[in-house]
Amino acid sequence: MAVAEFVGPGEWLGAELRDSDAWRVPLTEAHRREVLAACDSEESFPLPTLAPTLHRVRDELMHGRGFVLVQGVPVEQMTERQCERAALGLARHVGAVVPQGPGARPLMHVRDTGADPSRAKSYQHSGRLGFHSDPTDVVALLCVRPAKSGGLSAIVSSVAVHNELVRTRPDLAELLYQPWWHDRRTGDGPDSFYAKPICTVDDDGRVSVAYGPDYLRSAQRGATVPPFTPAQEETMALLDELTNDTRFALTMDLRAGDMQFLNNHVALHSRTAYEDYREPHRRRHLLRLWLTTT
């Protein structure tokens, strides 16, 4: 098949945005008080002055660059239960919160459990996460506490990476539209593995990139999964090179109170490995939510 570049605001370069505040949304003191009050409200998290800002966040996610960093959520004044309520409440003004997999909860605690990174879910270990997308429209991460060191978040425009591949290696770009085997990490049986393309084009003619190299590689353990072809290996190596190129990637050091929103169709995200504190009450803790916007 012939592949083509896609033009739009979802194509951006990290090098051009690194010193920009255009993607940051700092909360005012009035907004912070409103969030605290909403945490104790019997209503459905009312945000009379902040809600319009969050609606603009949604618009930027769906029709703009595809990512926003909200800053200043007053987590330092909240209990863990209030942080959960704040994360859910803020997210619901952006989209519909959905379970994170069959039988899963709508809110996940991202903490190191000491699990093996090659077999565990990404929110359960402290190892490095390569650039990937989550299987939902939008992923939101509220930082309650950062790590002692490491744990940096990096994002990249998957549209920009796709277009670079089309320009430089159209033969490999074509492979992204063919089925690749993925690992659900739900066990060792055949139902744990499935095949789907990395790139698809939606009804509006926009490219959507669903990429998770860690899950592609771990799928190789499946008894019925064919080994990577040399061309697939080359494609993954080039994607790894491009996504980690500082020209494309934008790094964020999430601090307590930062809430990152990301459109998975047009952006990939990663995390560096991290070292945690020994004391449980100081350890890295993020809250993750999946949203739909349709």
Regions found by a protein language model. Give the residues of each.
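Active-site environment of non-heme Fe oxygenases that use a 2-His-1-carboxylate facial triad
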Residues: 1-50, 55-56, 63, 68, ...
